[in-house]
């Protein structure tokens, strides 16, 4: 079967934003204009097409990044049909993992900002993730019809807070309730969308006289930015004082793909203005799979290899999301980087070392699905029938194996205990939690050895609340949930040398393991490190991995309160063995004993997670909010003014003090303040806090 759309006409984009910037509405409009949806779904009615889990529709926030395929030929049908895969990503800070996961498989992103709120803390997180994966992006300033909307303020915030290099390619005509349309700086025309056709039609007119000077100034900045793309364009610009439309687009496209600039547009998705222009920019300025470097990976012989985005390359793909669908069972969303695969073919998963048969292949449109026979380089689709694959796994041609770079997922910062309400729930709960943990790598499940309770861990209160809710709805499991617990860590502050000796000789085969370890603090963030410094075979080679294994197991539970020990370095420098009685188990035990004894002498310390908190509050409640943050051991780090007497307070607060904060910030401000928080780093807990935690254990 030949390719329907050439790969150069593919765009794999993510739509990413802070909660409430209007991202889901923007995506809905894209689906409407590209002809997929005939009735626009509104988030207000809980009917948005991309938000397809029940909780999302109730809460009006997006949790799962559903992948959708649509086609666009331009506002004037000026392009050949382009195949656009959209990955909708959540804006709530507890779901940052979803954003991270979709950034890995995108070629480009559209960042949506609210014209009133501008750049929010979550926007900074998403921006950092896009930088980490080198994702080219454009910015869309939404909600231009809202009171307090200011496009140019958001341009400045992108420069200041995100260190971005925004280049507006349109400027707004009016703002707030007088927002009428945009000036297209490339064509130098004013564009007004027709409200009766829900923005399907538009008029291009002369630029209003009062905007002529502004438009000329912004156009000049845009043309200069385009000219910097190459020497050839710069010479043209210097000679002629301007560039042709085609040259401007070429220059902007080159620099956008190189992540040097971010084209900026604006509009109001809710009122059907501006999204159409953004779609044109996606086609003109964002990369196709062949415009970005080939994907890299590790070949079977451990050397580095790569795969070009071409049909004639060997097949390679990355599984980036797992979902349980009520009708077809487990769906694995995957991005094809190279080659072609048909339903029924065998793929190899090098991470699990297993071959699997690819069952049906589905192209997803939010929650509707279309069965297709094959997928090619650049496609994003969902597979049914893969039993082994989990998020971040590579799928490839069994004859030409490559392992693509795996994703790294953050450690959870909060735990709660869950108890099934009945015996029948007990069995179903294990299955349900296993399924949910498979879908979401930032969610962990374990059994507490002492209490026998099931402990679930995640990225925040909302994250766990929604997972428990899904367990109730999708798996019919009723469970009661305990109070949230903080994920403390332990570390050491001093270096010590410690002996560990495990000897058991009571008839028959004995056990003998003996080690000397240097135990010292490691650099923050470095984690666990093991160094083998044995000379002259005093501990035989074959037992050294057992020492490493014993230590790895031991650091999962520290001596203060049983929390994992982080940032610690072990050097095995001496020891002894017995010809007959020594074995791996004995050395594992000896290492574990040395760690337990040594840690007690190495000034063990409790670490607690600190959160970056931002509170937006009307000025009159500022005192209450600041006082409350201080009473929670918060350190205020700065303040900013926003439109309409709103103040933004930034602080660092220990997570243990933030439980139930949403209720208390509402009562402090009569429901008018909002806040967001995300994990920042671990820091030493004050003595009184550490003692309280240790005594509780």
Curated annotation (Swiss-Prot):
GTP binds at residues 17-24, 88-92, 142-145. GO terms for molecular function: GTP binding; GTPase activity; guanosine tetraphosphate binding; translation elongation factor activity. Keywords: Cytoplasm, Elongation factor, GTP-binding, Nucleotide-binding, Protein biosynthesis. Its main location: cytoplasm. It is found in: Cytoplasm. GO terms for cellular component: cytoplasm. One of its GO terms (biological process) is ribosome disassembly. SMART domains: EFG_C, EFG_IV. Pfam families: EFG_C, EFG_III, EFG_IV, GTP_EFTU, GTP_EFTU_D2. Residues 8-290 form the tr-type G domain. It comes from the Bacteria. InterPro entries: EFG_II, EFG_III, EFG_III/V, EFG_IV, EFG_V, EFG_V-like, EFTu-like_2, G_TR_CS. Gene3D superfamilies: 3.30.230.10, 3.30.70.240, Elongation Factor G (Translational Gtpase), domain 3 (3.30.70.870), P-loop containing nucleotide triphosphate hydrolases (3.40.50.300), Translation factors (2.40.30.10). Catalyzes the GTP-dependent ribosomal translocation step during translation elongation. During this step, the ribosome changes from the pre-translocational (PRE) to the post-translocational (POST) state as the newly formed A-site-bound peptidyl-tRNA and P-site-bound deacylated tRNA move to the P and E sites, respectively. Catalyzes the coordinated movement of the two tRNA molecules, the mRNA and conformational changes in the ribosome. Belongs to the TRAFAC class translation factor GTPase superfamily. Classic translation factor GTPase family. EF-G/EF-2 subfamily. This is Elongation factor G. It comes from Dechloromonas aromatica (strain RCB). The lineage of its organism: Bacteria, Pseudomonadati, Pseudomonadota, Betaproteobacteria, Rhodocyclales.
């Amino acid at each position: 079967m030949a390719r329907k759309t050439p790969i150069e006409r593919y765009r794999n984009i993510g739509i990413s934003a802070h909660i409430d910037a209007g991202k889901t509405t923007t995506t809905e409009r894209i689906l409407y204009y590209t002809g997929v949806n005939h009735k626009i779904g509104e988030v207000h009615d809980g009917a948005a097409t991309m938000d397809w889990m029940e909780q999302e529709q109730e809460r009006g926030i997006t949790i799962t990044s559903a992948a959708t395929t649509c086609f666009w030929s331009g506002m004037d049908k000026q392009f050949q049909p382009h195949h656009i895969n959209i990955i909708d990503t959540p804006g709530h800070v507890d779901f940052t993992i979803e954003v991270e996961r979709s950034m890995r498989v995108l070629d480009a992103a559209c960042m949506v900002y609210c014209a009133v709120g501008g750049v929010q803390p979550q926007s900074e997180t998403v921006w950092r993730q896009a930088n980490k994966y080198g994702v080219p992006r454009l910015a869309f300033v939404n909600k231009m019809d809202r009171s307090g909307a200011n496009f140019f303020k958001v341009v400045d915030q992108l420069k200041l807070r995100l260190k971005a290099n925004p280049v507006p390619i349109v400027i707004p005509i009016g703002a707030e309730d007088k927002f009428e349309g945009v000036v297209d700086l490339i064509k130098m025309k004013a564009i007004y969308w027709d409200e009766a056709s829900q923005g399907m039609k538009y008029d291009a007119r002369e630029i209003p006289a009062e905007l002529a000077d502004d438009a000329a100034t912004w156009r000049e900045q845009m043309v200069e930015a385009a000219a910097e793309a190459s020497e050839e364009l710069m010479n043209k610009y210097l000679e002629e004082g301007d560039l042709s439309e085609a040259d401007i687009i070429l220059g902007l496209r080159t620099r956008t793909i190189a992540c040097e600039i971010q084209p900026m547009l604006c509009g109001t998705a809710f009122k059907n203005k501006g999204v159409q222009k953004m779609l044109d920019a996606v086609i003109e300025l964002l990369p196709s799979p062949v415009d970005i470097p080939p994907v890299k990976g590790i070949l079977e012989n451990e050397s580095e290899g790569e795969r070009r985005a071409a049909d004639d390359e060997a097949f390679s793909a990355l599984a980036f999301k797992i979902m349980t669908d009520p009708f077809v069972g487990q769906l694995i969303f995957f991005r094809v980087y190279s080659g072609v695969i048909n339903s029924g073919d065998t793929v190899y998963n090098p991470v699990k070392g297993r071959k699997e048969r690819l069952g049906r292949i589905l192209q997803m449109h939010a929650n509707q699905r279309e069965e297709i026979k094959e997928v090619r380089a650049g496609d994003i689709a969902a597979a049914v029938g893969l039993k082994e694959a989990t998020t971040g796994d590579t799928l490839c041609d069994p004859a030409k194996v490559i392992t693509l770079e795996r994703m790294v997922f953050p450690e959870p910062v909060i735990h709660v205990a869950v108890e099934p309400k009945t015996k029948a729930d007990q069995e179903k709960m294990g299955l349900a939690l296993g399924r949910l943990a498979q879908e979401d790598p930032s969610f962990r499940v374990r059994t507490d050895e002492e209490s026998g309770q099931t402990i679930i861990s995640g990225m925040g209160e909302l994250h766990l609340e929604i997972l428990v809710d899904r367990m109730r709805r999708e798996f019919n499991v009723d469970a009661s949930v305990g109070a949230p617990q903080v994920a403390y860590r332990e570390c050491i502050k001093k270096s010590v040398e410690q002996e560990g000796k495990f000897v058991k000789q009571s008839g028959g085969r004995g056990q003998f393991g003996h080690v000397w370890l240097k135990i010292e603090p490691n650099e923050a963030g470095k984690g666990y490190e093991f160094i083998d410094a044995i000379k002259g075979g005093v501990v035989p080679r074959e037992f050294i991995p057992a020492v490493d294994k014993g230590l790895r197991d031991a650091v999962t539970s520290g001596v203060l309160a049983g929390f994992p020990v982080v940032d610690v370095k072990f050097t095995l420098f001496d020891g002894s063995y017995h010809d007959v009685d020594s074995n791996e188990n004995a050395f594992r035990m000896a290492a574990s004993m040395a760690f337990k004894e040594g840690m007690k002498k190495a000034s063990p310390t409790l670490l607690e997670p600190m959160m970056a908190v931002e509170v937006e509050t009307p000025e009159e409640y500022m005192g209450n909010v600041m006082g409350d943050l201080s009473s929670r051991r918060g350190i205020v780090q700065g303040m900013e003014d926003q439109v309409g007497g709103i103040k933004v307070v930034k602080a660092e607060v220990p997570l243990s003090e933030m439980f139930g904060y949403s209720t208390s910030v509402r009562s402090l401000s009569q429901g008018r303040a909002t806040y967001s928080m995300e994990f920042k780093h671990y820091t030493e807990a004050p003595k009184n806090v550490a003692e309280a935690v240790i005594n509780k254990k």
